[in-house]
Amino acid sequence: MESLFKRPFMVYGLAAGLRTVLLFYGAWQDAHSAVKYTDIDYMVFTDASRYVSQGDSPYARDTYRYTPLLAWMLLPTTWAIPGFFSFGKALFALSDVVAGWLVAKSLTLTHGMSAERALKYASFWLLNPMVANISTRGSSEGLLGVLVVALLWAVLNRRIYLGGVLLGIGVHFKIYPFIYGMSILWWLDEKEFTTNKAQSESREVKPKFKDTPVGIFISQILSFITPCRIRLTLISLLTFVALNAAMYLHYGTPFLQHTYLHHLTRIDHRHNFSPYSTLLYLTAASSAGAVGHDAGGPSGSFESLAFIPQLLISVVVIPLVLGKKDLPGTMLAQTFAFVTFNKVCTSQYFLWYLIFLPFYLPTSSLLRNPRLGIAVAALWILGQALWLQQGYLLEFLGISSFLPGLFLASLGFFAVNAWILGVIVADVGGLNLESGNEKRRVK
């Protein structure tokens, strides 16, 4: 096994081969089984592409809640060429492999690892059957993996302009990467202090005033406003606004409604691991039963209020506590918290944080303490298995298992994830700045 990682072409070949096998198996299962391998989201993507190919809006397809860019990218699925319907799956699978390659390169260039060791950790993504399964079923998360790892690499290498563009594209493509903005801005402080100390000193308030509470506060504000932070903020905002303006001019209000505003009041209780799922189910049921009546009330604001604890933890608390310790670890903790506390949590969302595992594992307690690592993996898988068992009763046997089965399973999985989040935060918080900076040093 050790010799495997000395041959990168073998690792990448295995990663590509695994996905190729799954693509062919998926085509066979779709043709011979009532239970389809292809994810329903892929059908939504390709239907939207078909509408675009006919000169219509992708939002003519019900439940298409994504940027038009995705429908444009999958236009080859509409071509009358045998096998091209799976073009999108192949693209997503290839993106998986590219994301893994970027992870390995980042570990080598910014973390000072040997190519062999970096590839070993990158294989937690490249050779992960769950990652391969999700992409070959037609989930587009691999594209986000490429964008997020490229963003991380750009920031760690001080490519501020590139980082700003990638952040803007990522947020346009799938909203959630906006959470990384805070941690990146906070992390840049350490670098800015060491490289632009003279500039910081030139912005200090007058000596007689700086020791007062107001003076200290003003000094802290001024020291936070640095050229790097300004450039990153402006470029990411300009990129995001430019993409949205172009899409709005082309598709109008439906673009804003379906791509962004829909998520504020989204009610999605199917295939949802979140403990909110049962409440969403009850909300959906009450809304359906309120035909001809006022459907307002507490349930009407529930979907929006669910964002408060999620955003407070992932956007404010974690970046401020961990941001200066280790950027990849902070981004992992942010993403894990965002997914755990999200009102909608599906298997695809797990890929959002799994992409950071290769950066986290080298210094994590999960490897230093194998028992802890095994317990984390076992409970995480068991939590999903219990939920899926209840979901099977509901989806395939027609047994109403929302209460108490699915609700208790969701609470159990949430508790497991909250515990794992605590482990991650403790690990990243335990790093000292010197070791973190040394680990990120470019050779």
UniProtKB/Swiss-Prot annotation:
Keyword Transmembrane in record: yes
Biological process (GO), any one: cell wall organization
Transmembrane segments: 8-28, 68-88, 90-110, 136-156, 160-180, 232-252, 273-291, 302-322, 347-367, 374-394, 406-426
Pfam assignment, any one: Mannosyl_trans
GO molecular function: alpha-1,4-mannosyltransferase activity; glycolipid mannosyltransferase activity; mannosyltransferase activity
Protein localization: Endoplasmic reticulum membrane
This protein's UniProt keywords: Cell wall biogenesis/degradation, Endoplasmic reticulum, Glycosyltransferase, GPI-anchor biosynthesis, Membrane, Transferase, Transmembrane, Transmembrane helix
GO CC terms in record: endoplasmic reticulum membrane; glycosylphosphatidylinositol-mannosyltransferase I complex
EC annotation from Swiss-Prot or TrEMBL: 2.4.1.-
Family: Belongs to the PIGM family.
Record function comment: Mannosyltransferase involved in glycosylphosphatidylinositol-anchor biosynthesis. Transfers the first alpha-1,4-mannose to GlcN-acyl-PI during GPI precursor assembly. Required for cell wall integrity.
Stated name of the protein: GPI mannosyltransferase 1
